[in-house]
UniProtKB/Swiss-Prot annotation:
The gene is pckA1. This is Phosphoenolpyruvate carboxykinase (ATP) 1. It catalyses: oxaloacetate + ATP = phosphoenolpyruvate + ADP + CO2. Involved in the gluconeogenesis. Catalyzes the conversion of oxaloacetate (OAA) to phosphoenolpyruvate (PEP) through direct phosphoryl transfer between the nucleoside triphosphate and OAA. It is an enzyme of class 4 (lyase). The keyword ATP-binding applies. It is found in: Cytoplasm. It comes from Moorella thermoacetica (strain ATCC 39073 / JCM 9320). Substrate binds at R55, Y190, K196, R317. Its cofactor is Mn(2+). Its EC number is 4.1.1.49. ATP binds at K196, H215, G231, L232, S233, G234, T235, G236, K237, T238, T239, E280, R317, T442. The lineage of its organism: Bacteria, Bacillati, Bacillota, Clostridia, Moorellales.
Length: 525
């Protein structure tokens, strides 16, 4: 009798062949043999996820039980679903899996052994199992032998919910059950749902252990100094943390404990629309055999990749293990950060390319989480629009925003970290008339912030937003540092700045229990 690896404990009975922790090459072979994708000219496995090319936030639910009810910030992000609804759907899902070959990944989330969690992911598709093999932390043979998962994800894209029977909004569903330590995903092939489900789990569990979970990338300088880059999808977390002059800790999800910071993952999930070897050489070179390309156009005959094409989606992605980046820190841990960067892609074109924040301003802008929702990262978003995503990660935060803000604020204060706001969005006008901020200039400004060069320049307070804008920065033309100077008609800039300021005030009004010092640290003009 073949080994079932304990799947019967999940209610999965009579499966076909179960493949557990296959090596990368075997998963690629099987995916190709099953017609799940094709091999691109650089050796990466290229797949198409169908109509779901981004996360489906409106199809994500948390099972409402007495044990978690008072800990969850219920609402449009954390939608409740009953235990009965979950069990009904779960029963049909496990029946669907009977007779099917399944791919199991047993590994970990959390690079710090003190906080890492053993996880299991069960996949219907070989390519998705390759994805999680590359994205999470892979076990040693010894660790695998004694592996007991504390949380399990079952992902079956071919199984579709029936909304009128299952109580879902659509055929797609992502349901987190904290009591059962189980996540079920169906109806969508977008691999990011698995990654972000585990992130949400960590965001729920870690605050109880005194750890601040963060939607950020992190890197380390030659002297061991670390930096964090917060931001929503498409704002530059992966791009800016992959710096040949520094060592990459991780590109998306981290924890900040009393010992320092640690990566949750063992891989990267990079946006690759318009990727170029010139501007992002580390990411370009990391996409090779063993990597997964999601919804990237590949010529079916010559297999040449067209990174410029958004024919399938703007949200094209590449997944690869962190050690495909030559200067990655293994394991992904570092000391307490000296610099914290908040990234925003401002579609209004009024935010400066870089500004320094006081601690109170840092809390204001962290809670605000302003950016522009960029095309493709969520279904239905086809052009950028202003959005406020609390703590730069509202879709993944099950608890009250103040839980995360207090944890971060306490650590910034205790370790005296410098905080900067960096705009990777538009300058010279709003989206449509302005232009996207130059990546080389952004890199130069971030470099100046990290190496202390900005400590030596003069700053001037922004009359509307209050933060401090540098008058000079090495490697950057002085005229672009003040965004008002980049607009042809300054009165239009002033009107747009006032418009954005009013949106900030309107959004922040929902934070009733925030100290007055933080409320007053925001918009001033």
């Amino acid at each position: 009798m073949s080994n079932t690896y304990g799947l019967e404990r999940l209610g999965i009975i009579n499966p076909g062949t179960i493949y557990r922790n296959l090596p990368m090459a075997r998963l690629v072979e099987i995916a190709l043999a099953r017609g799940e994708g094709l091999l691109a000219s650089n050796g990466a496995l290229s797949v198409n996820t169908g109509k779901y090319t981004g996360r489906s936030p409106h199809d994500r639910y948390i099972v409402d039980t007495p044990a978690v009810h008072d800990s969850i910030s219920w609402g449009a992000v954390n939608q409740p679903v009953s235990e009965a609804t979950f069990e009904r759907l779960y029963s049909r899902l496990t029946a669907y899996l009977q007779g099917k070959d399944l791919f199991v990944f047993d590994g970990f989330v959390g690079a710090d052994p003190a906080y890492r969690m053993p996880i299991r992911i069960v996949n219907e598709y070989a390519w998705q199992n390759l994805f999680v093999h590359q994205l999470f932390i892979r076990p040693t043979a010894e660790e695998l032998a004694g592996h007991e998962p504390r949380f399990t994800v079952i992902c079956a894209p071919g199984f579709k919910a029936i909304p009128e029977e299952d109580g879902t909004r659509s055929e797609a569903f992502i349901i987190l059950n904290f009591d059962r330590r189980l996540v079920i995903i169906g109806g969508t092939s977008y691999a990011g749902e698995m990654k972000k489900s585990i992130f949400t789990v960590m965001n729920y569990l870690l605050p109880e252990q005194g750890v601040c979970p963060m939607h950020c990338s992190a890197n380390m300088g030659p002297a061991g100094d670390t930096a964090l880059f917060f931001g929503l999808s498409g704002t530059g977390k992966t791009t800016l943390s992959a710096d040949p002059e520094r060592y990459l800790i991780g590109d998306d999800e981290h924890g900040w404990s009393d010992k320092g910071i640690f990566n949750f993952e063992g891989g990267c999930y990079a946006k690759c629309i318009k990727l170029s070897a010139e501007h992002e050489p580390q990411i370009w070179n990391a996409i090779r055999f063993g990597s997964v390309l999601e919804n990237v156009m590949v010529d079916p005959d010559c297999r040449i990749i067209d990174y410029d094409s958004d024919a399938l989606t703007e949200n094209t992605r590449a997944a690869y293990p962190v050690d495909f980046i030559p200067n990655a820190v293994i394991p992904g841990v570092g000391g307490h950060p000296q610099t914290v960067v908040f990234l925003t892609a401002d579609a209004f074109g009024v935010m400066p390319p870089i500004a320094k924040l006081t601690r109170e301003q840092a809390m204001y802008y962290f809670l605000s989480g302003y950016t522009s929702k960029l095309a493709g990262t969520e279904r239905g978003v086809t052009e950028p629009k202003a959005t406020f995503s609390t703590c730069f990660g509202a879709p993944f935060l099950p608890r009250s925003p103040m839980v995360y803000a207090n944890l971060l604020g306490e650590r910034i204060a205790r370790h005296n970290a410098s905080v900067y706001l960096v705009n990777t969005g538009w300058t010279g006008g709003p989206y449509g008339t302005g232009r996207r901020m130059s990546l080389p200039y952004t890199r130069a400004m971030v470099r100046a912030a990290l190496n202390g060069e900005l400590d030596k320049v003069e700053f001037t307070p922004d009359p509307v937003f209050g933060f401090l804008v540098p008058k000079a920065c090495p490697g950057v033309p002085a005229e672009i540092l003040n965004p008002r100077n980049t607009w042809a008609e300054t009165e239009k800039y002033d009107a747009m700045a006032r418009k954005l300021a009013s949106l900030f005030r309107e959004n922040f009004a929902k934070f009733k229990d925030v100290p007055v010092s933080i409320q007053e640290a925001g918009v001033v003009g």
